[in-house]
Amino acid sequence: MSEELLPPTLQNILDQKSLKWIFCGGKGGVGKTTTSCSLAIQLAKVRESVLLISTDPAHNLSDAFGQKFSKDATKVNGFDNLFAMEIDPTSAIQEMVEQSDSNGMMGSMMQDLAFAIPGVDEAMSFAEIMKHVKSMQYSVIVFDTAPTGHTLRFLSFPTVLEKALGKLSTLGSRFGPMISQMSSMMGGEAGSQEDMFAKLESMRAVITEVNTQFKDPEKTTFVCVCISEFLSLYETERLVQELTAYEIDTHNIVVNQLLFPKKSSNCEHCSVRHKMQQKYLAEAHELYDEFFHIVKLPLLTEEVRGPEKLKEFSEMLVKPYQPPQD
């Protein structure tokens, strides 16, 4: 195993005061939520205000802190400047549709056309979330993302909305006058087509601006969370490749749930598992040592739940964990 070139902590994230967006992502069940909550706690010590957002429909933030969060930013108990919110992208789009002024035939037809394009509903709900978040003026925003696969989908959203705008524009210019006439004859409101265009256009502008920020390493970074097993490491490598292709900065990997059996321990299961973990940990070092901070966290005997346990756990992100000696 080559010598570690970069400190095995996330202190670099706390030191980089220009960061605005921090994503924590990886395979399901590797401890993303615990990591993102712990990182947010550490950031709250050095930044003016921190917002922690979960876009995972499983809503693990409430479980982690033992406090109910909703789609509105709520102050986390025990902190003055840490806020959390849980968003379900699918319900966000539903609410938006209900709130939008879609009376009359034109409005509903335009909506149907827009949503017939794959990914438009997700893109629009993401834009709504971003519009909301941007208006809130937090110093830094930490995303606890859904498991890998969904994580990077938002990067294709500007293209998706461009497509929706193009399609609506073509259909609107062909059939718009006729449908508007029919709509007004049936008592519908005029201008629904323009409303729909305006909504899509403003959302596209928001997503394009946000994506530009996501590609700026001064403003955005992605923390990959994994465990020391083949599938998780494979998934992490895929994630790193994808992030690189999308030009999103990533230079921190958190390896969770590591076993450190005592020499005197005669637990066969523990030593076999420890050996396997060390093998994949060596591979991780080989792959990432040069450009990544690799943070090693232990498998604990109890769950990390509640503000106090999370505060305690968060210290291991900035001070390397030392396994107890025999």
UniProtKB/Swiss-Prot annotation:
Its EC number is 3.6.-.-. Its main location: cytoplasm. Homodimer. Zn(2+) binds at residues 267, 270. Pfam families: ArsA_ATPase. GO terms for biological process: tail-anchored membrane protein insertion into ER membrane. Keywords: ATP-binding, Cytoplasm, Endoplasmic reticulum, Hydrolase, Metal-binding, Nucleotide-binding, Transport, Zinc. The lineage of its organism: Eukaryota, Fungi, Dikarya, Basidiomycota, Agaricomycotina. InterPro entries: Anion-transp_ATPase-like_dom, ATPase_ArsA/GET3, ATPase_ArsA/GET3_euk, P-loop_NTPase. GO terms for cellular component: GET complex. This is ATPase GET3. Signal peptide: none annotated. Gene3D superfamilies: P-loop containing nucleotide triphosphate hydrolases. The keyword Repeat does not apply. HAMAP family: Asna1_Get3. It is an enzyme of class 3 (hydrolase). CDD domains: ArsA. ATPase required for the post-translational delivery of tail-anchored (TA) proteins to the endoplasmic reticulum. Recognizes and selectively binds the transmembrane domain of TA proteins in the cytosol. This complex then targets to the endoplasmic reticulum by membrane-bound receptors, where the tail-anchored protein is released for insertion. This process is regulated by ATP binding and hydrolysis. ATP binding drives the homodimer towards the closed dimer state, facilitating recognition of newly synthesized TA membrane proteins. ATP hydrolysis is required for insertion. It is found in: Cytoplasm; Endoplasmic reticulum. GO terms for molecular function: ATP binding; ATP hydrolysis activity; metal ion binding. The active site is at 56. NCBIfam families: GET3_arsA_TRC40. Belongs to the arsA ATPase family. ATP binds at residues 27-34, 229, 256.
